[in-house]
Amino acid sequence: METGRGKRGRGTGSVSDFQFPVSSNRLAPRGRKIYEGKWKILYETQDPALLIQRFKDTPMVGGAAPRAKLPRRGAMKNQISAAVFRLLQKNGIPTHFVEVVGERDMLVRRLEMIRLEVVLRNIAAGSLAKRLGMEVGTTLPAPVLEFYYKSDALGDPLLNEYHVRALGLASSEELRAIRETTFRANGVLLPFFAEREILLADFKLEFGRQKGALLVGDELTPDGCRFWDRTTRENLGKDWARRSLAREAAAYQEIFRRVCT
């Protein structure tokens, strides 16, 4: 199993000095916008099987007023996600990622997305700790897998597998593949981040269909992962993002330095 280079700690590079790598691709020109969400915009390309996924610097909150801009957020999200997608693909886990084609843009395979957020928890935190009365920071005896229904109107409720099938979101075979892929991804990601002095408390995956196959889609960034410093257990991910723009910027830059520089 490939987990990246040798042990790494805090990076020393400056985000402002980093030259964000971009691949040249004839499909890079963006076409019609087909989707815009909180964090991303999707555009068509000349190939109907491929899309441009653009990461925003300024996400929308509740579809209304935007949050304050975090400079180069989109570029950092793009590079962090690309690095993790490449790692998963090297370890036999298929994703929608093709290549980076712009500072904030990646070329991705067009998927029929499944309306599930699949959360894998290694450490008690967030809603799990609150819901079950567990002490935050407790290492779980075994990873916990959860499903959430992607529905803004319903508040993304927690589901079990019977709910998933009752709603027609995924078949039993697809759920089995999703479970297996998520646990495999955890086995790849844990040592990768540990080498960078990061504890992966939990993370979110989304899946989509392409020609009968299930692929990991969406993104893998601090907005969907709970990262802690391995030594201090200082928050480096989405917990910081919920407090202030300054702390969110510091969290993003620290994760970016450890993963991408």
State where each predicted segment sits:
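Arg/Gly-rich low-complexity intrinsically disordered repeat tracts
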Residues: 1-11, 15-24
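Phosphate-binding core of ATP-grasp and ATP-grasp-like enzymes
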Residues: 138, 143-155, 186-199, 221-226
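Short histidine-centered catalytic/ligand-binding loop motif
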Residues: 65-75, 158-181
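Active-site loop/lid in soluble adenylation, ligation, and acyl-transfer enzymes
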Residues: 29-149, 259
